[in-house]
Structures are given as C-alpha cells and as structure tokens.
Amino acid sequence: LVFIEILSLVGGNPGIDCGGFCEFCYFKRVDYKILDNSSIGCRYCPPIQMECDYCYSKIKIVKSGFKPPSEVLKEFQKELFMQELLGFLNFKDLKVNVGSWADILNYPYLNELISYFKELELPVNLGYTSGKSIHNEKIAENIISMGVDEVSFSVFSMDPNKRKRWMNDKTPEESLKALKLFCETIDVNCATVVIPDVIDRADIFRTCSILEDWGIKMFILSRFANFKNQGLILNNKPTIDGKNTHSINDFHELVKDVANEFNFRIIGLPASDPKNDIPFIISRAKYKKYLEELPPINSRATLLTSKLAAPYLKKIFEVIDEDNLVNIINVDKEIADLITHEDITQINLNEVKKKVIVPGGALIRDEQLKKLFNKDGNQRIIIRGPQVLSPFDIYGNMDKEELIRGELKAFRILIERINQ
C-alpha cells in the first residue's frame, strides 16, 4: 500500500528538547543568539526583505520550542486543504508523519495529538526519537497501545557503551529494549550516523544483523558532517574538533555494501539509494536510452550546481548537449539546497555565460544573486532551476520507473529554462 504522507511538525529545540545533545549533533554548536542576524534568504524573499515565512520555517524555527497542539492541528488542517485543492486527498491513502526538530517523545502533548489522528483512523508515524527519553519499557508500551503504526528510531549502535558515550543516553539498555519491542510490534525505521573510528563497518554490520532478526523495515546511514561545505551553514565551527569525515564516494560505497548484504531497505544521506541507482538514475550507462526523450538544447547557459551533483550532471550533459552550449560550474558546497551567498562569491565570473541557471532551492535571495553575478559589470540573466533534479523517496513509495519519470520531468523543466 502506497501512502501520501503529510508531515505534521511539532517544533522543539534540538538538544534542549532531546534530553541533551548527542556529541555528533549538527545543532550542538549553533549560536542561537546570532541566528536572527544570518544573511540567509531564499527565492521567496521579497526584494527588500532578507527573510520570509519559507526560509524562517526552514532555518530559524529550530529555536522556537514546541508548538501548542492547536497550532500543530491548524497547520495539519491547512495541509489537508492544500492536498484537497491539488486533488491528492484520499483518506484511505493518507499517513501522518508526526515530526520534530527535537525528540518527538518529549513533546508534552504527544498523547493528545496521537489520539486526534487515530480518531480520524489515520496511520501515524512518529518521525524521530533517539530513545533517550525511554527509561523503561512502559513508555514504549504506551506508544504502541495508542495505535502508533510506525516509528523512526536513531539507534546509532547496538553497543550500549557507544550510545552512552556518543548519544549521552543515560539508560542505553532500556532504549535498546524499547527498540526491540517496537520492532516486534510495529514498523520501525532505524538510523545511524557514520563517524570514522566510531561507527565503522563492523559496527554497522553487527547493528544491521540484530535489526534484521528483530524485523526492521528500513535503515538509514547518515554521513557525519563536520565542515561548512558539507552543510554546516548555521555555524562556523566543526561539530567535533579534529574529526575527519568520509568522502562522498567512500560513503556511497559503504551504503552499497550494506544494501547488498541485507534484505530490508537501506539508504544513505546525502542521497544514496543503491537499489534504485540514486542519485541521478539517468546518468548511468544502462539508462542512457531515457535521455533520448529529452528535448534538444538550443541556448547557451551556465548551470550552477553542487559538488555532489556536478559529476552526474556532466555525464548527462555530455550526451544531451551535443553542441556544448552549457557549461557546468560547481561550488564547494556538497548539497545544492544549502548553497548560500558565500559560495557564490568564490565563483570565477569569467567562466559564467550570459544566462545562469541556479538551483531552485539555493538559500540566496534573487536580488543577492543578481548583485553577485553582475558585479563584474555584465548584466547576466539569472534563472532558478527546478527545486529537485533527482527525486529522493526515503520511504520507498515510488518504484524505479516512477523515479526515472520524476528525473525526466525535472530535466525537461531545466532544459526549458535553459532555452527560454
């Protein structure tokens, strides 16, 4: 059964509402006092305004604490209305993902919220818990008895000592007992953070072997990020001083090895879904035939992208751009949606053509983009590309053909904007 999932965010402050920061938490060294003065904007910001509702909700809401249930339900009903307007609303296929910037089990009105959704007979997924707030099995039993259908659990490691040291879990054995109970009773998605010399290959395989016996649904490996180009845009300090990280290639190879070993769904973040050849399915040689469906390129442009996406895009454009009308420039930032004005200042404008296609989700105001790309006196045309070029379906609701069609649709939009 494929569900349409509606995210219902209850807010919460990372770390503060998690039972303490994990040692590897991205938010651990964010200076919340200066967050309001950050120069991050987005495509939706008005010309004379640095911040709008959209980028506030994405960046600065992390310091706003938990929302009252009335606000959560109001936003949920608004989302239902939008789904109805778009023609997507069908209660039979609807699932609610109750999520938080912190640990969802610390939300003081959780029981009330779950009861509301269950009265509507909706499946409920609790979007994230570290398990640190579970001090005995009764807490897990209560969650199950309320009718929760699915839970996402940050296991980190099956070694209680590692959970205690790196997650600051005061009762790691109880957390793992609760995880076992969840796995035996409802659907469970687990996650770990891959940290060199801490969570290594042997630890991951041991954790996955136990979880397979328990009946896990999905396992997510997140690469530990410790540097600004990896996405630390809200602070200038590493999360853990002196700690190295895996390269993207090494990380993706690790995810592939784990996926080949186990039968449950395994994905990696940043985007890696080995079973579906993600990211950028259509860049692979065995799917080259699909590129024939794309329209021709007939205009010159520079395509700005991220360090991670650039190699895949170059492979695709080598095939579809026969006249070499488009050059691809990447900044050092690994994820396009986290590109900020600082990344643009590092670009050599001599390599930039008259028309520039910028990632749709880049965290820069359009007015800033114009100033930065035209500071050499050239009046360039700045166009936003699609929000996503390679759709990433975390919960596995789309088959490979649907994912390919999603990529082709995004690239048709991209080529249309290149040609306009």
Where are these regions (language model features)?
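Flexible, acidic/Gly-rich N-terminal and inter-domain linker regions that tether
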Residues: 1-55, 372-378
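Hydrophobic faces of well-ordered beta-strands that scaffold small-molecule active sites
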Residues: 5-10, 94-100, 124-128, 149-153, ...
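Core AdoMet radical
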Residues: 29-107, 113, 117-135, 143-175
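Surface-exposed amphipathic alpha-helices with a cationic face
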Residues: 80, 111-121, 144, 179-184, ...
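Active-site beta-loop-alpha junctions enriched in small/polar residues
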Residues: 101-103, 129-133, 156-158, 193-197, ...
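Catalytic cores of alpha/beta
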Residues: 137-141, 196-214
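Conserved strand-turn element in the central/C-terminal portion of the radical SAM core barrel
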Residues: 160, 178-203, 225-226
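Auxiliary Fe-S-binding modules of radical SAM enzymes
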Residues: 205, 212-420
